[in-house]
């Protein structure tokens, strides 16, 4: 990441980064046949995955965690997650739902 001195420039840089993230959202089967929504592709060096997960869990009223650089949410929330990530500033066109 280039060195940015001006805080406004840093905010703009983060916004541009958000719009360039290719995010993949899909489901996996967890224990006992339960589903979990997996969100991967968000750069964990540039963005606080814990904070994003916290916001998503609050909006979706579900549990979840951050593991191995990806966000895991309990239940199938694929379509809702796409809209919520777009609301957080990520480009909706680059969010791939499987």
Swiss-Prot record:
Pfam families: SUI1 (PF01253)
Keywords on record: Protein biosynthesis, Translation regulation
Domain of life: Archaea
Single Gene Ontology MF annotation: mRNA binding
GO terms of biological process kind: formation of translation preinitiation complex; regulation of translation; translation reinitiation
PROSITE patterns noted in UniProt: SUI1
Family, similarity comment: Belongs to the SUI1 family.
Name of protein: Protein translation factor SUI1 homolog
Biological source species: Thermococcus onnurineus (strain NA1)
